[in-house]
Structures are given as C-alpha cells and as structure tokens.
C-alpha cells in the first residue's frame, strides 16, 4: 500500500492514499493512530480509541510491511510491531474522506514507554497474560508481550494458546480488521476459552495459520467485534 506524506506548519498529513489506509487498517471515526518513529525511513503503528487509553495494536492483515512514498519528507515503512524508546506521532481519524485534513498528526507526550499514566512500573510477564496449558512460552513470545504489554490497560491481559483441532468453536460475529469479507463466530466456553468457527478456514489460510501455530488475537469492539492477529 502506497501513501504520500506532506508536512505543513509542523504537522504531518497523509495527503494521498488516505482512503486506502483507512480501509486497510480498519480505522474508525474518532480513533487515533500512533506512529513511533524508528528511523527516517521506518515507523511503527498503534491504534487507540477516542479516549486515547484503550491501546490496540494495528497489525497489517497481509503480515507484510506497508511501504509509503515520500512527499516533501522521507519515505517511511510501517512495521507491524510497536517498539518503545522512540519519538512518536498521533493521527486522529475524523472521516473516511481522502483529504490531508483528516490525518493531521500531533506530538504524543502523555503515554509513557515503561509505566502507565498513574506512574506505576511496567507489569511482569505473568501479570500481562494467561498461557493455556501445553503452550510453550518461547523467547519470541516473551519479547512480544514485553513490547506490546506496555500499551495495555492495567485491567487487560493477553490469553495465549497453541492452535489445535478443537480450539476453533464459537457464536458471536467478528470481522478481521481490514478484511470485511472474512467473518467468523466467537464463542466463550465454560472453561473461559474463546473459540472461533464459521469462516475460520478462510481466515487461517489468508494469515498462514497452521496446526501448532501460536497466534495472538487482539479483540476490540468498534461497534462490531473486530480482531487483529499476530502469528508467531
């Protein structure tokens, strides 16, 4: 996906390709995009709600990097993994129109990288997630949780499972962000597992999910339940 960035009066705008960007990310009116600047040519992306405090990772559905073209600024690559200790920007989405005024950015200084807004320290791995039985916690998983976890509300946790033949079974309609044609049903079992069914085969094939893959789902509710996913 190609977009063009333009800088006017100290603010950055997506001046071309905004409509495609919104469709690809599943961005909704009132939500925010946080860009963490890694280098002059690379940035990471996080999605926030209207209050800026429900922090939701934005993962490109293709699992590939999104490249952008420059316009009065250097070209950038949008990565699918946020990383701390870098400068950041925030884009507020107010409509679906493909105009630069819809994508104005501002500095982000109210979201710390190693503590929450109340000044509490970074949460431990055990405090950040539940791991299903028989799920091996690899260094990659721990690293992922340590990076993403800082953007969770303190009441939120990850639930990590290893995909198996009985995991995908449920009853609430969900959509993959950026892929409205892929819908599934979500169901919560008596032992608190969340399972998916109907449409799962198509979704798994699209995202290269196989038996024994470890997947991290990010569920959020725009008004409809949507998900983004990482496959480790």
Swiss-Prot record:
One of its GO terms (cellular component) is nucleus. Keywords: DNA-binding, Nucleus, Repeat, Transcription, Transcription regulation. InterPro entries: B3_DNA-bd, DNA-bd_pseudobarrel_sf, Plant_B3_domain. The keyword Nucleus applies. Residues 95-107 have a biased composition (Basic and acidic residues). Gene3D superfamilies: DNA-binding pseudobarrel domain (2.40.330.10). Residues 92-121 are annotated as: Disordered. This is Putative B3 domain-containing protein Os11g0242900. It comes from Oryza sativa subsp. japonica.
């Amino acid at each position: 996906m190609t977009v063009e960035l333009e800088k006017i009066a100290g603010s950055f705008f997506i001046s071309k390709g905004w409509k495609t960007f919104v469709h690809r990310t599943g961005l909704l009116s009132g939500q925010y995009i946080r860009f963490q600047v890694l280098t002059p040519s690379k940035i990471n992306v996080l999605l926030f709600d209207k209050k800026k405090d429900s922090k939701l990772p934005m993962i490109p559905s293709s699992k590939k990097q999104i490249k952008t073209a420059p316009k009065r600024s250097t070209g950038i690559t949008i990565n699918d993994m946020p990383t701390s200790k870098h400068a950041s920007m925030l884009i507020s989405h107010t409509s679906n129109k493909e105009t630069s005024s819809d994508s104005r950015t501002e500095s982000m200084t109210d979201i710390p990288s190693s503590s929450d807004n109340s000044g509490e320290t970074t949460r431990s791995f055990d405090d950040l997630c539940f791991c299903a039985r028989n799920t091996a916690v690899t260094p990659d998983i721990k690293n992922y949780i340590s990076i993403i976890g800082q953007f969770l509300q303190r009441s939120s946790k990850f639930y990590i499972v290893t995909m198996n033949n009985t995991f995908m079974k449920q009853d609430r309609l969900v959509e993959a962000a950026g892929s409205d044609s892929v819908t599934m049903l979500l169901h919560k079992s008596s032992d608190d597992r969340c399972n998916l069914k109907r449409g799962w085969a198509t979704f798994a094939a699209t995202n290269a999910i196989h038996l024994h893959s470890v997947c991290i789902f990010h569920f959020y509710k725009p008004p409809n339940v949507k998900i983004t996913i990482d496959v480790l």
